[in-house]
Amino acid sequence: NGSGAEVYGINIDGKIAHGRDASLQVGFTAQRSRYKELTYWSEDSSVEGTRNMPRTPDYYGYFTFTAAPSKNFDFSLSGVYTGRMHVPHFAPTDEIPSDSPYQYIVKDEMVHTPDFFDFNVKLNYTFVLNEHVKLQLNGGVQNIFNAFQEDLDRGVFRDSGYFYGPTQPRTYFIGIKLFN
């Protein structure tokens, strides 16, 4: 834990809509989160301290746009932006066997991550089967740009806490819904 912290910033959220036809909701946060003094986060005394609070990006935001261009068809676009941040990456404390198929870091390090933009699209079409039953088909793509952490640890000696950014790679989905 740090000896004290300064956290400040600004958050902006907004929504605009035109009936059922279209709506846009957006939010953005710009913040600064720093310890007042160097904080030593590793048990390894040779690892430098930091004033940056781990896992707290200075910038992040989101948007959701939905539209229904016709009575039976609607779609949504959404996205989440996560700015760069500092994330601790701990080296294994156990001795790594020489025949291990994986490479591991040898010293704890504070990693300055890349930023990520997770973009999604979903399409829906509703068929009216009769006055009491409707069938909706939907499909889309989550994380279209495949924004994903590329340096995940692997194997038995991995740092299981070392992850950041979107947790799901590009994913295609389809669905069906029956309702009244």
Can you annotate each of these PLM segments?
Residues 1-91:
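Gram-negative outer-membrane beta-barrel transporters
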Residues 12, 26, 65, 77, ...:
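Hydrophobic, well-ordered secondary-structure elements that form the walls
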Residues 6-8, 57-61, 115-119, 133, ...:
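Residues that define the transmembrane beta-barrel architecture of outer-membrane proteins
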Residues 98-108, 117-124:
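Short, local alpha-helical segments
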Residues 18, 45, 100-101, 132:
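Intrinsic-disorder/low-complexity loop/linker signature
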Residues 8, 43-49, 101-109, 156-160:
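Extracytoplasmic loops and strand-loop junctions of Gram-negative outer membrane beta-barrel proteins
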Residues 80-99, 125-180:
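C-terminal beta-signal and adjacent terminal beta-strands/loops
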Residues 2, 14, 49-53, 65, ...:
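Outer-membrane beta-barrel proteins
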